[in-house]
């Protein structure tokens, strides 16, 4: 998704909302479309990486699963709850928050999170590598 051309631009192009929020919505929509469209079920070996930690996709997994349980149209292309497929994709670490990164890792597993930079749209200070190496949660939990 582009920071200046996404679904949030149409609704509210002010206050940097398209970059700060719209990009995350688009990331989640990509994940939902791949999952509910059955792409990951039809192609189980396909490797997909969703940017920006998947946006709110993992946070919404419970709602997606509930929708799959109670709405027949959500089960047309997939035979398992959507959260199952979230754990088959990869995500970059660009969450900009230790809490969000921790939630992502706890939801999909550290083996599904890769280094990202968000370049050229956002300049990192410190660098992505420095940021990860300074995350107490990662250092304490995974012996980086």
Language model features with spans:
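H/E-rich (His + Asp/Glu) clusters that bind or coordinate divalent metals
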Residues: 12-38, 42-43, 47-144
């Amino acid at each position: 998704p582009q920071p200046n051309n996404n679904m949030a631009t149409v609704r509210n192009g002010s206050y940097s909302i398209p970059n700060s929020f719209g990009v995350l919505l688009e990331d989640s929509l990509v994940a939902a479309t791949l999952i509910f469209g059955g792409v990951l079920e039809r192609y189980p070996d396909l490797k997909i990486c969703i940017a920006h930690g998947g946006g709110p996709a993992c946070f919404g997994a419970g709602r997606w699963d509930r929708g799959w349980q109670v709405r027949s149209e959500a089960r047309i292309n997939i035979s398992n709850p959507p959260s199952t497929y979230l754990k088959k994709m990869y995500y970059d670490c660009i969450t900009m928050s230790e809490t969000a990164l921790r939630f992502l890792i706890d939801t999909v597993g550290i083996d599904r999170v890769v280094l990202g930079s968000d370049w050229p749209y956002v300049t990192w200070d410190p660098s992505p590598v420095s940021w990860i190496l300074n995350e107490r949660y990662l250092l304490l939990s995974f012996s980086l």
